[in-house]
């Protein structure tokens, strides 16, 4: 009987959104313990080697990171298996590049480059609001942050804008009808739309009805909804290619044909 934490991860058991080839080895890099769960994160080794192709192997990734060229959310990271997750900002000082991890409509983490002005903050979904010792209020975000003395109007499911230099809340968005949201789980992962209606179910999961830019309506759980803007067309963060609009197979075919001039 095995005891203790698991230290290995078979490549076939790795999350599909890492997009690792089945025949390129027996094992995959297992994410370290960190702010994001294993199946909701992307190890820095996979990001640098497989997505950016800045390294050919894990040894080269280690050499890059030990030179302290890689920052995640404003802090230097030297662990090649550090788990970066949704809304995290990855900075490469050597090339002066900034990336934000966000989902595309295929459910994969997109390589989304952002400007230096946008790289100074991130968004966090409020998971709970509580009182600590001596009555000190605090909020806990989706990435494990605990922020004390928040605005009294902040509630669960709201989104806070976090300044990476200070770690403090700069502003927040209330969860309400008409807000621009991105889906972070389920079959609609990566889609972006506006909240139309929140359906409360007794003894079950609350459902949220969302309408995208093409007037298509879909439903997902409340736990999968992440507010990213106050209204349609005005997100607080730039969106990856596709802008969160999911097309059918025939619509994608027609778009490719139009781009090729056929």
Swiss-Prot record:
The keyword Ribosomal protein applies. Residues 42-105 form the S4 RNA-binding domain. Keywords: Ribonucleoprotein, Ribosomal protein, RNA-binding, rRNA-binding. One of its GO terms (biological process) is translation. It comes from the Eukaryota. Belongs to the eukaryotic ribosomal protein eS4 family. This is Small ribosomal subunit protein eS4. It comes from Candida albicans (Yeast). The lineage of its organism: Eukaryota, Fungi, Dikarya, Ascomycota, Saccharomycotina. The gene is RPS4.
